[in-house]
C-alpha cells in the first residue's frame, strides 16, 4: 500500500545501507557503531572497532556485519550479544567498497577477497569456499579482485562480480 510503518533518526550519519528482516532494522554509523532498531525503536548499539561499508544483514534473529577488513561479526538481534567473529587470513590491501553479504537457506554467503565463502550462521565456521575472482597484475592494486556487492540471487544461483574483473555465478546448493 505504500503506507509508512515507522520513521526514526539514529542521531548519526549512516555509513552503509539498511539491513532488515521486517522486524529488526540495522545500520552502521560512520563512527563504526552498529545500531539495531526493533519496530523503529532503538533496541541496542555496539561499537564495532572496524570500518563498515556493506549494509548489515538481518536474518534468523541475528545481525551479521562485514567489515572492510573482511571480518564477519554475528550478533543476537534481541539483545546485541556478540555470537561469533570470523577472521580469515587474506591480502593486506582491501577495498573500501560494499562487499557480498547474503543468506541462502541455512548458509551465510560472504565475500572474502576474491572468494565466496558459505558460512554456518550459528557457529561462524566455513562450510565451503569457491574462488570467483582471479587476481592479475603487476602490483597489489592491479591484483585486487575482491567480490563487490550487490550480489544477485536467482533461485539457487548467486551471481557476483569482482573488482576490476568479470563476474560469475555459482549454485549455492
Please identify what each model-predicted range represents.
Residues 4-21, 43-59, 82-105, 129-155:
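Extracytoplasmic beta-rich repeat domains
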Residues 29-30, 67-68, 111-113, 162-163:
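Structural signature of WD-repeat beta-propellers
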Residues 148-173:
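Beta-propeller domains
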Residues 38-41, 76-80, 121-124, 171-173:
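Short loop/turn segments that connect beta-strands within beta-propeller blades
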Residues 70-71, 81, 114:
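Tandem repeat domain/solenoid detector
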Amino acid at each position: 500500500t505504500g503506507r509508512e510503518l515507522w520513521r526514526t533518526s539514529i542521531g548519526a550519519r549512516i555509513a552503509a545501507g539498511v539491513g532488515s528482516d521486517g522486524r529488526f532494522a540495522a545500520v552502521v554509523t560512520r563512527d563504526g557503531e552498529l545500531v539495531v532498531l526493533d519496530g523503529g525503536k532503538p533496541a541496542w548499539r555496539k561499537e564495532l572497532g572496524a570500518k563498515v561499508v556493506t549494509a548489515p544483514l538481518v536474518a534468523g534473529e541475528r545481525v551479521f556485519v562485514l567489515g572492510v577488513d573482511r571480518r564477519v561479526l554475528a550478533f543476537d538481534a534481541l539483545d546485541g550479544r556478540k555470537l561469533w567473529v570470523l577472521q580469515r587470513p587474506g591480502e593486506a590491501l582491501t577495498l573500501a567498497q560494499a562487499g557480498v553479504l547474503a543468506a541462502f537457506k541455512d548458509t551465510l554467503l560472504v565475500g572474502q577477497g576474491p572468494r565466496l565463502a558459505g558460512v554456518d550462521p550459528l557457529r561462524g565456521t566455513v562450510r565451503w569456499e569457491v574462488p570467483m575472482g582471479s587476481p592479475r597484475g603487476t602490483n597489489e592494486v592491479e591484483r585486487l579482485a575482491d567480490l563487490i556487492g550487490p550480489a544477485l540471487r536467482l533461485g539457487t544461483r548467486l551471481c557476483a562480480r569482482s573488482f576490476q574483473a568479470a563476474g560469475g555465478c555459482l549454485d549455492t546448493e
